[in-house]
Every structure is written in structure tokens, then in C-alpha cells.
From Swiss-Prot:
Keyword match Disulfide bond: no
Region listing for Disordered, in residue ranges: 97-121
Lineage per the UniProt record: Bacteria, Bacillati, Cyanobacteriota, Cyanophyceae, Synechococcales
Name assigned to this protein: Small ribosomal subunit protein uS13
Single GO biological process annotation from the record: translation
Function: Located at the top of the head of the 30S subunit, it contacts several helices of the 16S rRNA. In the 70S ribosome it contacts the 23S rRNA (bridge B1a) and protein L5 of the 50S subunit (bridge B1b), connecting the 2 subunits; these bridges are implicated in subunit movement. Contacts the tRNAs in the A and P-sites.
Family recorded in the similarity comment: Belongs to the universal ribosomal protein uS13 family.
Keywords linked to the UniProt accession: Ribonucleoprotein, Ribosomal protein, RNA-binding, rRNA-binding, tRNA-binding
């Protein structure tokens, strides 16, 4: 397995697909990186030469990926919560953030149903 950006890339996959195992890199960005670095996207990771791996590493330095990206996203959410805006409060309460209804639906975000004791008649 080649190790790029702190991630073990699967050996038997094409380079184009293997790069998507890195957090922050999808198929479109992987194609862009391969084009810039001049690496053939159709070869397998196990067939890459050391020079090709080094080219990929230098091309990846231009992007925010892995731990830096996770930290950046976490800081953005924390900032919203700290300033007390509606989006931050909704994140804190684990409710939908973008204006969706919650009287029905929103089960994924709200979690499993909690039984509330009803009044007896």
C-alpha cells in the first residue's frame, strides 16, 4: 500500500479511484490532481513509480485535506455555536439546520423516538 497524506491507499485500485480514499478528495478533484501531476489515471497504485507518488504528494499539498479539513469544519461549527446564531443553536440541539420541518420527519437528525408518558382520561 502506498501512503499518501497519512492515508493507506489500496494497491489494487486505479489511482483515480484510490485517491478518493483521502478525506476531502472526490473523483473530480482526483482527476484534476492527476492531470496537473501528469500521472496516468488508468494505472493501478501498485504499478506507480516512486517519482509518480512524489508528484502526487506535491500536487496534494495545494489542497486542504484530511486532518486540516476536519479541523477547519469543526472550527466552523464551533464558531456558529459560539456566536449563538440560529444555525449554531440547531447544530447544538441536533436538529435540522436548513429550515426543514420537524413536526414530522427529521428522524435521522433527531434520533430514535423517545416515548413520552401520556395523560390518562
Amino acid at each position: 500500500m502506498a501512503r499518501i497524506a497519512g492515508v493507506d491507499i489500496p494497491r489494487d485500485k486505479r489511482v483515480e479511484v484510490a485517491l478518493t480514499y483521502i478525506y476531502g478528495i472526490g473523483l473530480t478533484r482526483a482527476k484534476t490532481i492527476l492531470t496537473k501531476s501528469g500521472v496516468n489515471p488508468d494505472i493501478r497504485v501498485k504499478d506507480l513509480e516512486d517519482g509518480d507518488v512524489q508528484k502526487l504528494r506535491t500536487a496534494l499539498e495545494a489542497f486542504t485535506i484530511e486532518g486540516d479539513l476536519r479541523r477547519q469544519e469543526g472550527m466552523a461549527l464551533k464558531r456558529l455555536q459560539d456566536i449563538g446564531c440560529l444555525r449554531g443553536r440547531r447544530h447544538r440541539m441536533s436538529l435540522p439546520v436548513r429550515g426543514q420541518r420537524t413536526r414530522t420527519n427529521a428522524r435521522t437528525r433527531r434520533g430514535a423516538r423517545k416515548t413520552v408518558a401520556g395523560k390518562k382520561k
